[in-house]
């Protein structure tokens, strides 16, 4: 998917990118490749692959969930900024917070935000477990996203505490995670969440499967969650 095909594909979904936004994506790609030589940000560096598997894939969440209705989003473990930075470029009104435990990624994201001229973006170098216990962030976000390989039960403990009551947690998975979801149901309920939607689709060109799960926050998360750093991964609630 080259930049023009990317622009056309988004237009077909109702997202019309301006010349400025296209330039932001171009600069994002160039910075990603340049910085990737110094630090391991991504295994994907071919232009067509980046536009498809990073940019388009990140934005695909907005085809199924109305992002114009959100004000604040938090991206947990965003790495090189996916999915939240491509979404922010398309929906500039969003206030975006990214939390990641690797300092070098924060350095990249700071430089990226400056280069792209992004406002209302904040980067936090922290463990998700600690961040979720921070009163300045706990239950403060309209939407929390995770595009991660961690199991659903682990992601639920790291992310649901950050969602405000009435807000949503959006999980982006490659393969369908029905079995994973069944195992995680106990944890999701315990943390105050309820699964309300599941969207399954094929990424264009390569036709690989993608899945989006929407979990609404119906009640507050008990104070003891998330547990200490490392515990959710070692001893997931299942």
Curated annotation (Swiss-Prot):
Subcellular location per the Swiss-Prot or TrEMBL entry: Cytoplasm
Predominant cellular place of this UniProt entry's protein: cytoplasm
E.C. designation(s): 2.1.1.-
Keyword Ribosomal protein in record: no
Keyword S-adenosyl-L-methionine: yes
GO cellular component entries: cytosol
Enzyme type, top EC level: transferase
GO MF term (any one): rRNA (guanine-N7-)-methyltransferase activity
Residue positions binding S-adenosyl-L-methionine: 77, 82, 128-129, 147
Keywords tagged on the record: Cytoplasm, Methyltransferase, rRNA processing, S-adenosyl-L-methionine, Transferase
InterPro entries: rRNA_ssu_MeTfrase_G, SAM-dependent_MTases_sf
Pfam (any one): GidB
NCBIfam families referenced in this protein's UniProt entry, alphabetically: rsmG_gidB (TIGR00138)
Function: Specifically methylates the N7 position of guanine in position 535 of 16S rRNA.
Family, per entry: Belongs to the methyltransferase superfamily. RNA methyltransferase RsmG family.
Protein name listed in UniProt: Ribosomal RNA small subunit methyltransferase G
């Amino acid at each position: 998917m080259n930049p023009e095909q990317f622009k056309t594909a988004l237009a077909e979904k109702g997202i019309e990118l301006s010349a400025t936004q296209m330039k932001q994506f171009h600069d994002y790609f160039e910075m990603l490749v340049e910085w990737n030589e110094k630090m391991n940000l991504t295994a994907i560096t071919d232009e067509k692959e980046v536009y498809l598997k990073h940019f388009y894939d990140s934005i695909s969440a907005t085809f199924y969930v109305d992002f114009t209705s959100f004000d604040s989003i938090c991206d947990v473990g965003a790495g090189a900024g996916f999915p939240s930075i491509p979404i922010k470029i398309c929906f500039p009104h969003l206030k975006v917070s990214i939390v990641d435990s690797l300092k070098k990624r924060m350095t990249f994201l700071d430089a990226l935000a400056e280069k792209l001229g992004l406002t209302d973006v904040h980067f936090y170098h922290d463990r998700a477990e600690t961040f979720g216990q921070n009163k300045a962030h706990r239950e403060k976000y309209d939407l929390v996203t995770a595009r991660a390989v961690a199991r659903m039960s682990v992601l639920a403990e790291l992310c649901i505490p950050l969602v405000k009551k009435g807000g949503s947690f959006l999980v982006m998975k490659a393969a369908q995670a029905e079995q994973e979801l069944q195992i995680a149901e106990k944890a999701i309920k315990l943390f105050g969440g309820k699964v309300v939607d599941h969207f399954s689709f094929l990424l264009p060109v390569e036709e690989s499967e993608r899945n989006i799960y929407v979990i609404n926050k119906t009640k507050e998360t008990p104070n003891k969650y998330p547990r200490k750093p490392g515990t959710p991964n070692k001893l997931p609630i299942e």
